[in-house]
A protein has these predicted regions:
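STAS-typified acidic loop motif
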Residues: 4-35
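Short amphipathic alpha-helical segments, especially helix-boundary/capping motifs
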Residues: 10-14, 44-47, 70, 118
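Short hydrophobic/aromatic-rich motifs at helix boundaries and adjacent loops
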Residues: 7-10, 40-42, 65, 115
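Short acidic DE-rich linear segments
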Residues: 172-176
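Charged/polar low-complexity intrinsically disordered segments, enriched in acidic residues
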Residues: 116-170
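Long, charge-dense
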Residues: 93, 107-124
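Amphipathic alpha-helical interaction surfaces in cytosolic regulatory modules
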Residues: 27-106
């Protein structure tokens, strides 16, 4: 499962966090991204900008994790501001978002990303996900994509069945 994965860079301001994703946003980096966003939400950040200007490709697992946060953070909250915005996704990533029925979950921005001067840069550490964590994240991501767009059920039915069986086998192996 060793595959080049995304580099994540975080810039935080007083009321937002910007996560820059460089390289390949794939299944291998999905648990790190999910953990990062959850940690930032726990710290009180509710507005996220995901900078995709250097993201060359995104797979369905990463997109499913992104969609999970799109559903949670962009739910109507009366504030009028989306909780998560995508900045400068390339054509390939935009087409994937559209083809899998997830583009509507996000506000997309294009052009130069201008951030306030008072941002702090931090580089998150990897959680070094186990095979089980990657499998669970991938399963949940594909289930989300199936829930977002009924057309995805046919696309991911076999994948989710395989992942569920794999996860079950991994959990059995852990039992004493």
């Amino acid at each position: 499962m060793a595959s080049p994965s995304a580099n994540l860079l975080v810039l935080v301001g007083s009321n937002f966090a910007c996560v820059k994703i460089a390289s390949r946003a794939n299944f291998a980096s999905s648990p790190d991204f999910k953990t990062l966003i959850e940690q930032l939400r726990h710290k009180g950040y509710g507005h996220f900008i995901v900078d995709l200007s250097e993201c060359v490709l995104m797979d369905s697992t990463f997109l499913g994790v992104l969609a999970q946060f799109g559903l949670k953070l962009n739910a109507p909250n009366g504030a009028g501001q989306p909780g998560i915005e995508l900045s400068n996704p390339n054509t390939r990533v935009t087409e994937l978002l559209e083809n899998l029925g997830a583009l509507h979950l996000f506000k997309t921005l294009s052009g130069e990303l201008v951030l306030p001067a008072d941002v702090t840069r931090c580089t998150p550490e990897s959680i070094h996900p186990t095979h089980e964590q990657i499998t669970r994240t991938s399963l949940e991501a594909h289930q989300t994509l199936m829930a977002v767009n009924p057309d995805n059920v046919a696309r991911f039915k076999d994948v989710t069945q395989f992942l569920a069986e794999d996860l079950q086998n991994l959990q059995k192996c852990k039992q004493p």
